[in-house]
């Protein structure tokens, strides 16, 4: 099965585990779509309990749980220290030929998630690329998704 009938999807997250929380069921269900995850930081700069190496390792373990249709990259800067132009340039320079981009929603309590959401329209400006948002644990309750992928807990267990 394909996600929205797309071949290649770019998933952008602010931190390790953002995309995985919001998209893991879709990764499992839509095994005929290639998902590339770009994490724009190694983790929280005020989190003294883990390191960016720990967080990156966690992501890599999650990506391996899927049937080869998920690969990812973790950028080592903090989102708050990057301006939108440099993040857009980094993504456009290193990742291309996508049918769809997914980002965190603008209706999110975390400022770095909102910053990542702002990248979506800029990345879609040149090509006919669909933009979809995924839910995170910090997404506000009044957010309304522009797509909902139904999952059966019995069909997509890990």
Segments (PLM) and residue ranges:
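Short glycine-enriched, charge-decorated loop/helix-capping segments at active-site entrances
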Residues: 77, 147-149
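Residue-level detector of flexible, active-site-proximal loop/helix-junction positions
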Residues: 44, 79, 138-140, 155
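A conserved mid-domain beta-alpha-beta active-site/ligand-binding segment of alpha/beta enzyme cores
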Residues: 149-158
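Short, flexible loop segments at boundaries between secondary-structure elements
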Residues: 128-145
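Active-site beta-strand->loop->alpha-helix modules in alpha/beta enzyme cores, enriched
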Residues: 1-16, 20-133
């Amino acid at each position: 099965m394909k996600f929205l009938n797309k071949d290649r999807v770019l998933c952008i997250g602010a931190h390790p585990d953002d995309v995985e929380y919001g998209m893991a069921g879709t990764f499992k269900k839509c095994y005929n779509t290639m998902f590339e995850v770009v994490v724009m930081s190694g983790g929280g700069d005020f989190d003294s309990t883990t390191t960016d190496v720990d967080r990156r390792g966690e992501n890599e373990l999650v990506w391996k749980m899927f049937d080869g249709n998920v690969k990812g990259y973790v950028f080592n800067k903090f989102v708050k220290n990057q301006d939108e132009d440099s993040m857009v340039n980094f993504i456009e320079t290193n990742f291309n030929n996508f049918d769809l981009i997914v980002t965190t929603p603008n209706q999110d309590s975390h400022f770095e998630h909102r910053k990542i959401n702002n990248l979506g329209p800029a990345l879609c400006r040149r090509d006919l690329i669909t933009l979809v948002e995924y839910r995170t644990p910090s997404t506000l309750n009044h957010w309304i998704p522009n797509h909902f992928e139904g999952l059966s807990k019995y069909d997509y267990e890990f």
